[in-house]
């Protein structure tokens, strides 16, 4: 049996696998959140739960979105932000959702991603520079972000 200190460290204080960062759509049709696949997997994915069907699905997963095989690259600015907020997760650690928009935005690896909640369709905008803190507009058509700031 694994000792408590080892288990506590491996599961990052028993937070791996726990859902977090919930957002509710304006009509209450969808709840979006971040969660890894299991208590052994540190990479958060973006999930959506449908009130009409009661089904939960992964709508964005960095392992499938980043196909260069090198994994996630984190900028100095993003590392500093994660340290300030004591973020210990990996993968998708934050996203922007607006209750009136059918889309969600997040950033990783010098790319800006827009995901359709219902369709799970992902648009990847590779910008070639470090970006962080994307914010989606109420209608979901525009995304603002910070770069070199």
State what each model feature region is:
Residues 1-149:
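Beta-propeller folds
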